[in-house]
Swiss-Prot record:
Keywords: Cytoplasm, Ribonucleoprotein, Ribosomal protein. This is Small ribosomal subunit protein uS2. GO terms for molecular function: structural constituent of ribosome. GO terms for cellular component: cytosolic small ribosomal subunit. Its main location: cytoplasm. Belongs to the universal ribosomal protein uS2 family. Disulfide bonds: none annotated. Residues 263-289 have a biased composition (Low complexity). Component of the small ribosomal subunit. Mature ribosomes consist of a small (40S) and a large (60S) subunit. The 40S subunit contains about 33 different proteins and 1 molecule of RNA (18S). The 60S subunit contains about 49 different proteins and 3 molecules of RNA (25S, 5.8S and 5S). Interacts with rps21. GO terms for biological process: ribosomal small subunit assembly; translation. Pfam families: 40S_SA_C, Ribosomal_S2. CDD domains: RPS2. InterPro entries: Ribosomal_uS2, Ribosomal_uS2_C, Ribosomal_uS2_CS, Ribosomal_uS2_euk, Ribosomal_uS2_euk/arc, Ribosomal_uS2_flav_dom_sf.
């Protein structure tokens, strides 16, 4: 990480750096856009561009100062067409009072005043400049500043503040939105001091698959309560009622069972059965009687 240009009180804590690394916010793509080159730390041998997380932290603080400078939080619009960022923008809006657009951005939201969903925000924040290109394009028509989470291959046209980070991973997106919300609340004074811990865990900003959660709930409902305890108790009681030290005579001698099985010689004539009799025709019947009469020519 490059030397920080921030005042000492704004420097990130070791826990913040560990969270950024654990969420893989520093891993970019293999493509590099020319305007994102100043935020590049190095390129790995496999071609993956590594982002300087020191620059990421500086841009998070810059974006938080811009957001905190707006008097009415409802004039801030947070947008995410990418599924991994929809939960994060909804939580960000709930904690900071911003307006969230999660999902498809309806064309004309910022330019067509006839539509019912028309908005006039003073600032928009997007999760991905590529998937939210329509919102950025309309913001450029009406002079709305844009803050965007930009990867190494993201287009930066009409983006005023780019936060360099991995904007494709669910954990990276959720963590950046969580850090941004925390810094905004600190600057607004909602959190008393910078040493005060925020009681909202970062997991609330992570994307969760609705189908996976629904299947998990169904599995929990169909599970019979106490079935495992009953089965375990029955097995334990069965084991307790047996004496494992008592063995059958000769059980400890190798080959005893095989010798007992082969002690009596096997005789195929012992049963007294007649193999020829079983194939004989029933009494009173002859092959001549059963065969049809031959035709006389």
């Amino acid at each position: 990480m490059a030397p920080s240009q921030l005042p000492p009180m704004f420097n990130p804590t070791p826990q913040d750096i560990e969270m950024l690394l654990a969420a893989q916010c520093h891993l970019g793509s293999k493509n590099l856009q020319v305007h994102m080159e100043p935020y590049l730390w190095k390129t790995r041998p496999d071609g993956v561009n590594v982002i300087n997380i020191g620059k990421t932290w500086e841009k998070i603080l810059l974006a938080a100062r811009i957001i905190a400078a707006i008097d009415n939080p409802a004039d801030i619009c947070v947008i995410s067409a990418r599924p991994y960022g929809q939960r994060a923008v909804l939580k960000f809006a709930a904690h900071t009072g911003a307006t969230a657009i999660a999902g498809r951005f309806t064309p004309g939201n910022f330019t067509n005043y006839i539509t019912r969903s028309f908005k006039e925000p003073r600032l928009i924040i997007v999760t991905d400049p590529r998937t939210d290109a329509q919102a950025i394009k309309e913001a450029s028509y009406v002079n709305i500043p844009v803050i965007a989470l930009c990867d190494t291959d993201s287009p930066t046209e009409f983006v005023d503040v780019a936060i360099p980070t991995n904007n494709k991973g669910r954990h990276a997106i959720g963590l950046i939105w969580w850090l941004l919300a925390r810094e905004v609340l600190r600057l607004r004074g909602t959190l008393a001091t910078r040493e005060t811990e925020w009681d909202v865990v970062v997991d609330l900003y992570f994307y969760r698959d609705p189908e996976a959660e629904e299947n998990k709930e169904i599995a929990d409902e169909t599970k019979v309560p106490g079935a495992e305890e009953i089965g375990a108790g029955a097995v334990e009681s069965g084991f307790a009622g047996e004496n494992w030290d008592t063995q059958a005579p000769g059980a400890g001698v190798p080959g005893t069972a095989f010798a007992a099985a082969t002690a009596a010689p096997t005789s195929w004539e012992a049963d007294g059965g007649d193999w020829a009799a079983s194939s004989a025709a029933p009494a009173g019947e002859s092959w001549a009687e059963t065969q049809p009469a031959e035709a006389k020519w």
